[in-house]
């Protein structure tokens, strides 16, 4: 079973959660560009990592060519030979074109770009309820994944905090930016005939079932 997937959707759509669950079921690796960047900037003798760290520390956006290089390097690893689930990339049409070109050199092509559709109000409700333990980093959701004790981490018994990113005004702004920035990428995959839309409000098990149907997965 081979599947090369791109996951698209607003912040709070659950892309990372779905990708992790699908990795458990199918063995297809979940490639989160956020995780790759966090890892690469920690490596002291990685020249590419050093460049990216300097740019991020200046508060600037990492240019496409560096992002592309990082993704290409990760997708060239052995575990991606039979598939991947890309989460957080591509964010621009230029990145989408680069990905297509790279896959072509490997005699591969994307199976599908899966768009998880979640209305703004649902995103706001999900993200503003998110809390994090400042000590261990464990993530909770006051609605869907609450701690056992009121606003205290189950493990550390430390009071949970809300990230600035998860405050309502910021969430609404992030949703607006997502719509503006991602629409061209959605249109790009739609024109190619590989865009698959999934209702991101139907619950995790139903969402997973939809994606498995898209890739023709059978565990028989």
UniProtKB/Swiss-Prot annotation:
It is found in: Cytoplasm. Belongs to the adenylate kinase family. Gene3D superfamilies: P-loop containing nucleotide triphosphate hydrolases. AMP binds at residues 33, 38, 60-62, 88-91, 95, 163, 174. GO terms for molecular function: adenylate kinase activity; ATP binding; nucleoside diphosphate kinase activity; zinc ion binding. This is Adenylate kinase. It comes from Thermotoga maritima (strain ATCC 43589 / DSM 3109 / JCM 10099 / NBRC 100826 / MSB8). ATP binds at residues 12-17, 130, 139-140, 202. The gene is adk. Residues 32-62 are annotated as: NMP. CDD domains: ADK. SUPFAM superfamilies: P-loop containing nucleoside triphosphate hydrolases. Its main location: cytoplasm. Catalyzes the reversible transfer of the terminal phosphate group between ATP and AMP. Plays an important role in cellular energy homeostasis and in adenine nucleotide metabolism. Its EC number is 2.7.4.3. Consists of three domains, a large central CORE domain and two small peripheral domains, NMPbind and LID, which undergo movements during catalysis. The LID domain closes over the site of phosphoryl transfer upon ATP binding. Assembling and dissambling the active center during each catalytic cycle provides an effective means to prevent ATP hydrolysis. Some bacteria have evolved a zinc-coordinating structure that stabilizes the LID domain. GO terms for biological process: AMP salvage; nucleoside diphosphate metabolic process; nucleoside monophosphate metabolic process. Residues 129-166 are annotated as: LID. One of its GO terms (cellular component) is cytosol. Monomer. It catalyses: AMP + ATP = 2 ADP. Zn(2+) binds at residues 133, 136, 153, 156.
